[in-house]
Swiss-Prot record:
Protein name: 3-deoxy-manno-octulosonate cytidylyltransferase
CDD domains noted in UniProt: CMP-KDO-Synthetase
Enzyme class, UniProt record, top EC level: transferase
Organism for this UniProt entry: Chelativorans sp. (strain BNC1)
Catalytic activity: 3-deoxy-alpha-D-manno-oct-2-ulosonate + CTP = CMP-3-deoxy-beta-D-manno-octulosonate + diphosphate
Domain of life according to the entry: Bacteria
GO annotation terms (biological process): CMP-keto-3-deoxy-D-manno-octulosonic acid biosynthetic process; lipopolysaccharide biosynthetic process
Family: Belongs to the KdsB family.
Pathway it works in: Nucleotide-sugar biosynthesis; CMP-3-deoxy-D-manno-octulosonate biosynthesis; CMP-3-deoxy-D-manno-octulosonate from 3-deoxy-D-manno-octulosonate and CTP: step 1/1; Bacterial outer membrane biogenesis; lipopolysaccharide biosynthesis
Gene Ontology MF term list: 3-deoxy-manno-octulosonate cytidylyltransferase activity
SUPFAM superfamilies: Nucleotide-diphospho-sugar transferases
Compartment(s) where it occurs, according to its Swiss-Prot or TrEMBL record: Cytoplasm
Amino acid sequence: MTSIILIPARMASTRLPGKPLADIAGRTMIAQVVARALESGVGRVVVATDTEEVAAAARAEGVEAVMTRADHQSGSDRIFEALQTIDPGATAEIVINLQGDLPTIPPEDIRAVVRPLENADTDIATLGVEISDEEEKANPNVVKIVGVPVKTASDALRLRALYFTRATAPWGEGPLFHHIGIYAYRRRALERFVALPPGTLEMRERLEQLRALEAGMRIEAEIVRSVPLGVDTPADLERARQLLSARTESR
């Protein structure tokens, strides 16, 4: 299956304006995310942005960039506009939505998100991590996957998602899983998803992936080892600088 990685990036972040161009270990954040995408070897890498400076920074890293409208409500809408521009012939069968604020994501996790699509019945794939921190279980900013295990050829842990929630769920004994917001869509699934109106549960939980579940689409989550650092605040940015500076120095 031919895959393409699309990285949505916008400058108008509420909590950390201008973050795609923030310096992290001598490179812009968008450059760091592009590097992780290229290291994954999954496929063509394209940055989708509404700001020419971000596009220029991406092109400086040797990848394509496409300008999109500034009024998109979600990264899914932004990457779909970009996809129509850069792949009008629909050659890419799998579309990966890699958030532009994940500079520390392991390349192997980008590869992992594609694996659930080996099941022909799966429309959308994503990632999760088993929660080990008790505080995370009750944290509404940590989205939980409510799902059931599915068999895999490699015996990897994978869930069929039945629901996503900010609540502590499911109830009772057993592990809870932290959702990581990277997605791999079958192209036809992305086309269907962006054409759907917002769902009732989506609006209540403020989680756009619930739109797909409400519409009967199948989402599977590959379970990986750790949650990548999402850069949303100045404190997150400083932590990313520490992590990537240490990684650079150890080489």
